[in-house]
Amino acid sequence: LLDGLAAIVRASHVLTDDDSRTFYSTDVFRQADVLAAAVVQPGTVDELQAVLRLCARHQAPTVVRGGGASYTDAYLPVRAGTLTLDMARLTRIDINEADLYVTVEPGVTWAQLYAAVGARGLRTPMWGPFSGLAATVGGGMSHYAVNYGSGLYGVSAESLLGMDVILASGEMLSTGSGGGTNSLPFYRYYGPDLTGLFVGDAGALGVKARMTL
C-alpha cells in the first residue's frame, strides 16, 4: 500500500515518521489514542482520487485533515492502519468574476480565499470560522461551520452551490447544477439537495475535492 501511495504522490509526500504521525493525529484539544499509519499529501485532485481508489482496493480506512483547526475529533484516527489524507497541497482557486462564484480545492484556507477575491475587489459573505482564518474551506463545509459573517448571511454552507466529492470507492460525484453537462452553478436549492448530504459529514460520506461558492 505505501509503495503504491508513493508512486501516486511521490515518496516525499507519504509521511511515516513518528513525529509526523503524532502531529497529524492531534487536533486542537487532544491526541488520538491510535496514531495514523501514514500521512498522505496529494497535490492534485487526480492524485487524491487515485489515492482513494488504492485505499479502496486495500480496504484501508482514511480520515481527512484540512487546516487542523478542528476540535471535534473529526479527523482523528480511531483504529490501527488508518491513513490521514492531508489536504494542505490542494489549494487551487478559480474565480468567476462575471457570475460571482468561486471554485476552490479543499486545502484552501479562508485567509487564502479572502486574499484572492479581495485582490479583485470582491469578498465572500463569510471569511473564516471561529477556529480562525487558517481553517480550510473544506473543513468549514465538513463541519457546517459558523463563520464571521454568519449573523447576516447564515452558516458557511449557505453559500455553497455544489461540489465534486470522491466517494470511498474512488468514484467522483458532482453535485448541484454545475455537475450537469454544459451547465454552470446557480442557486443550490432547486430540486433535491444532494449537495447538502455531504455538508457537515466531517468527510465520512465522501472527500470534498472541489467546492463552488
Listing of model-derived features with the role each one plays in the protein:
Residues 92-96, 104-106, 110-213:
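FAD-binding subdomain of flavoenzyme oxidoreductases
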